[in-house]
């Protein structure tokens, strides 16, 4: 993340820890399903829970940054065909999915962070997959990044991009 990036403090957690915590909020896997489905918009076959987890991580990162002016985690996002992904979460979804239990979750000790993530999860899980994907597809950061390479890195912390998110959230 170079260029017009804002000065960022190091994040306390990594994306896998946040992903594991999100998965723990859905112990019966009613939301983060490990099933294959055809994407309504792109017609690609996706793993529903993996798609939802990555979209949720992206939206939570944006909301967290706007509220606290720091990143929740430092992992890079990439603009892919079906939206935003964190490569390590995307490629290790199955192991994250099956290994989540209280012993394997990196402790997120900060109650404020846990509350923030829980509130976001409870709100975002009410949105359809189509709504989650349409957010990515209408996000200027995704549209300006998608198609530049086989794995285009998203630079959402660029001052211009943060300005776009602040405008959207102030409505």
Regions found by a protein language model. Give the residues of each.
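Domain-edge interaction signal
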Residues: 1-171
């Amino acid at each position: 993340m170079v260029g017009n990036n804002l000065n960022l403090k190091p994040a306390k957690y990594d994306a896998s820890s946040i992903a594991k915590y999100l998965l723990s909020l859905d112990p019966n896997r009613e939301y983060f399903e490990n099933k294959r489905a055809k994407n309504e918009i792109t017609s690609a076959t996706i793993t529903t829970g993996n798609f939802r987890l990555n979209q949720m991580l992206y939206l939570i990162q944006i909301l967290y940054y706007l509220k606290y002016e720091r990143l929740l985690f430092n992992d890079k996002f990439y603009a892919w065909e079906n939206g935003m992904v964190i490569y390590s979460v995307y490629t290790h979804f199955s192991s994250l999915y099956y290994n989540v239990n209280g012993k394997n979750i990196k402790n997120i000790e900060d109650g404020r962070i846990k509350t923030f993530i829980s509130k976001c999860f409870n709100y975002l899980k009410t949105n359809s997959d189509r709504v989650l994907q349409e957010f990515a597809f209408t996000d200027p950061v995704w549209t300006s990044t998608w198609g530049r390479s086989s794995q285009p890195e998203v630079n959402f912390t660029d001052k211009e991009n943060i300005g776009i998110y602040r405008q959207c959230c102030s409505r």
